[in-house]
Design a protein with these regions (language model features):
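Collagenous Gly-X-Y triple-helix signature in extracellular proteins
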Residues: 1-225
């Protein structure tokens, strides 16, 4: 059923709570096809499916994708919740390169770490730039469930479908600004790059413990002839 896929198509695969009504069960997840290659396709969720921090604790050493808590959450909690064993067998264990921050590629404090192998991952800044050809195309809205978890929703910026957009994570380390004292200007600290509601990837990202930024899982889905 997937052999005729092309870039820009939307497919349904897996299930996750989305309408914020657990009583009617999980809803099918919609995925945007970013790339087709032989018998597999690179997908990213059409909507922001959840609202999670990069790290649940205060460890700023977990700024890299390979060591962050969100990677573990995607690879365990989300993977097991959203897909059946049969569906999981179709998700490729993929090489996930440690791309540099495209806004500050030479900054030694933004070392992306080592490449990983994951079934589910976040897009890098480079991949966002490669697969989305406009700011409007990068804008993404959250599901009612994600919004119930505290997802920030813009007042004016809308997706191409006319929905109000939100922030979503990439997997690149970034600088973030943190204000711990109202009498002192914000200080630069560790963060992770984001796509903002306008579809821009600003030079300063989100704090690692930030609770209002969304998750758009990505994966390589394999299919049989």
């Amino acid at each position: 059923m997937y052999n005729n896929l092309k870039t820009g198509d939307i497919i349904k695969f897996g299930s996750y709570e989305q309408d914020n009504n657990a009583g009617n069960g999980k809803e099918k997840i919609e995925w945007l096809v970013l790339k087709k290659a032989d018998n597999k396709a690179l997908l990213v969720s059409k909507y922001i499916l959840d609202c999670q921090p990069i790290n649940t604790g205060s460890n700023k050493d977990k700024q890299k994708w390979e060591t962050c808590d969100l990677r573990e959450w995607l690879s365990s909690t989300f993977l097991n919740s959203a897909f059946t064993p049969e569906e999981r067998s179709s998700i490729q264990l993929s090489h996930v390169p440690a791309d540099k921050n495209t806004e500050n590629p030479g900054d030694p404090n933004l070392d992306p770490g080592n490449s990983t192998y994951d079934r589910l991952f976040l897009l890098s800044m480079l991949e966002v730039e490669t697969y989305f050809n406009s700011y409007e195309a990068r804008r993404c809205a959250g599901t009612p469930y994600a919004k119930s978890k505290g997802l920030y929703v813009a007042e004016y910026d809308k997706t191409t479908d006319g929905e109000l957009a939100s922030y979503w994570w990439t997997r690149n380390p970034a600088h973030a600004m943190e204000q711990t004292n109202p009498f002192v200007p914000p200080q630069k600290t560790s963060g992770m790059a984001v796509v903002d509601p306008a579809g821009v990837m600003p030079a300063y990202g989100g704090l690692l413990q930030q609770l209002d930024t969304g998750v758009r899982p990505a994966m390589w889905l394999c299919f049989k002839d």
